[in-house]
């Protein structure tokens, strides 16, 4: 079973998270950040993961700490759930349309954390959610999961649609990269390690 749990309690947040790679797209998400709850639900469904999140934070200030710490916990749980990475495909990508928006995500589960993001969101907020937090979440996810993550929003006019396409593509790309390929013997690297 490729799964892991994480808990993180600080003066700013209290987060409990359980993640399973080989899931059924089941999400049980409770956060103080409604837009993030929605995005995590989409990510889980499109990645065919199982994800449980209970997150509370100092959202009276803003959504930054909660969003960032969810990214940290999810990245750590994803890395642990991958185990030794033997037999995984390692690479994954997805191109996802959402009405007028088109987003592309490519990932390498390489143990070399990096985020490259090209997205010009037309609005600074979706509801009360600061759209700059999408980058913050993705960077913490990439850093803690030790993945090389590339995100491109090719175009779009509706900020909600653009971000939604990103999270759907992220789920699909990570599903592909983490899937087991029976042809792969050991870790998928000519170095013999990742």
UniProtKB/Swiss-Prot annotation:
GO cellular component assignments: cytoplasm
UniProt pathway annotation: Amino-acid biosynthesis; L-histidine biosynthesis; L-histidine from 5-phospho-alpha-D-ribose 1-diphosphate: step 6/9
Pfam families: IGPD
Substrates-to-products reaction catalysed: D-erythro-1-(imidazol-4-yl)glycerol 3-phosphate = 3-(imidazol-4-yl)-2-oxopropyl phosphate + H2O
UniProt keyword Secreted present: no
PROSITE patterns to which the protein is assigned, alphabetical: IGP_DEHYDRATASE_1, IGP_DEHYDRATASE_2
Main location: cytoplasm
InterPro entries named among the record's database cross-references: IGPD_sf (IPR038494), ImidazoleglycerolP_deHydtase (IPR000807), ImidazoleglycerP_deHydtase_CS (IPR020565), Ribosomal_Su5_D2-typ_SF (IPR020568)
Known EC number: 4.2.1.19
Enzyme class: lyase
GO molecular function: imidazoleglycerol-phosphate dehydratase activity
Subcellular location: Cytoplasm
Keyword Methyltransferase annotated: no
GO biological process per UniProt: L-histidine biosynthetic process
Keywords: Amino-acid biosynthesis, Cytoplasm, Histidine biosynthesis, Lyase
Family the UniProt entry places it in: Belongs to the imidazoleglycerol-phosphate dehydratase family.
Official protein name in the record: Imidazoleglycerol-phosphate dehydratase
Organism: Bacillus velezensis (strain DSM 23117 / BGSC 10A6 / LMG 26770 / FZB42)
């Amino acid at each position: 079973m490729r799964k892991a749990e994480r808990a993180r309690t600080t003066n700013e947040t209290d987060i409990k998270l359980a993640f399973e790679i080989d899931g059924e797209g089941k999400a049980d998400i409770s956060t103080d950040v409604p837009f993030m709850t929605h995005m995590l639900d989409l990510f889980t469904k499109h990645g065919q993961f199982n994800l449980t999140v209970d997150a509370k934070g100092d959202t009276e200030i803003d959504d930054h700490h909660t969003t960032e710490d969810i990214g940290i916990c999810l990245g750590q749980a994803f890395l642990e759930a991958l185990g030794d990475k033997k037999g995984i495909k390692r690479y994954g990508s997805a191109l996802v349309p959402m009405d007028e928006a088109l987003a592309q995500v490519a990932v390498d589960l390489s143990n070399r954390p990096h985020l490259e993001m090209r997205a010009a969101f037309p609005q600074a907020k979706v509801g009360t959610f600061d759209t700059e937090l999408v980058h913050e979440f993705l960077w913490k996810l990439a850093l803690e999961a030790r993945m090389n993550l590339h995100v491109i929003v090719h175009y779009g006019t509706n900020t909600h649609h653009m971000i939604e396409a990103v999270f759907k593509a992220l789920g699909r790309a990570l599903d592909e990269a983490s899937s087991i390929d029976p042809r792969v013997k050991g870790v998928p690297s000519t170095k013999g390690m990742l």
